[in-house]
Amino acid sequence: MDYLMQCHNIDIQWGNHDVVWMGAATGNWPCISNVLRMNISYNNFDMLEVGYGINLRPLASFANEVYKDDPCEYFMPHLINENKYDPVDPMLAAKMHKAIAICQFKIEGQRIKLHPEYDLKNRMLLDKIDYEKGEIEIRGKRYTLRDRNFPTIDPENPYELTSAEERLMNILEASFVNNEKLHTHIKFLYSNGGIYKKVNGNLLYHGCIPLTDEGKLKMCKLGDFVGKGKEYMDYLDKMVRKAYFNPVDKNGRDADIMWYLWLGKQSPLFGKDQMTTFERYFIEDKKTHKEHTLAYYKKIDNKEVCESILKNFGLTSEHSKILSGHVPVKIKDGESPARGEGRLYIIDGGISKAYQKQTGIAGYTFIFNSRIMALAEHKPYSQLQKDGTQKFSSPKVMIVDEMKRRLTIEDTDIGKQLRSKLENLKRLLKAYRRGYFKESNEKIRLS
């Protein structure tokens, strides 16, 4: 983020991982618990404690006390990167991981009850557990839990935080809300980002646009709002900004909308029917882990569907493209980033090492200049050697569209702005020549 803030011209289309951090910065407990759970899961202690100065000692003490005899084997962190400044014993990290995960499930259950409009009742699972038998019922089928140790859960009231958990969350909230470094980065995301962006005739967004099974724009209902396509995206953008800059609830609950965008079934940043976090931890049967993508991902192979989305955003040029990310493109399995006969490109950046084994590459960059549109395919970076050297590979560049004539500044968004300013100056000059403005004889003094 510090590097991005030094760039002279940058814009960001918020993704689900962005908004959950943005929500956490407001003090929103569902977002805070998700952010911590994910980063502990991937052993990102350097970023949390050294980078942002988030105080994890209370969580470590709590986890060590509550889960001291629990091996927490299904909560062992993924050791993709080593922590140089703040190494944490994997066993302790696993206990911290489980502790915050249980807090998350409790807090989310409370918020699901508070927001029936989110339609997330199927994600309330703690009350579906038979704690004596160590089983859970999901969609009419019973499963044995592979981890049955729940020392902080009251079977009669499973979503209630213990006094110790409540105290812990208050301390963690303070680390986010009063975090100058984090808020500097979050404000940068707001100043330079949005749910979507139209630029030079192209449409950029992170994930998807909700569609019906027929490929039409889906009417989305969220609280008092009902709308689709661009209207829905504009509404979400407004609500995300309001939750940070002008919240009604000082306890961070306005940011529940960011939590919804993280995992909601109508979230254009998530794009799936559910987030099966609980099942991945506690149930062996991988069928329960399945997260089904929304109709959008089945329909974007259709050129007409892509063009209807572009048209809804006021983009009708034959060269207009949709550029999105979110979903890793599995090149090694024969998948292609191009959809809708070249009207849409999924260009996940591939920075996350966790996905590179799935994709076989290190993501894409989309290039648009005055003559062509091109796609650059990157190879994973080699490890930095002890002598400070590092091997880099040139990307594979594929031209995907050629302009009929070379574009000029006049054809760009900046050109349109300059044209508008020129027309305004012409109208001003015309009005002056017709005597619509009175000349002032008052002298201006310069001090």
Where are these predicted regions, by residue range?
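Feature recognizes metal-dependent phosphohydrolase scaffolds
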Residues: 1-447
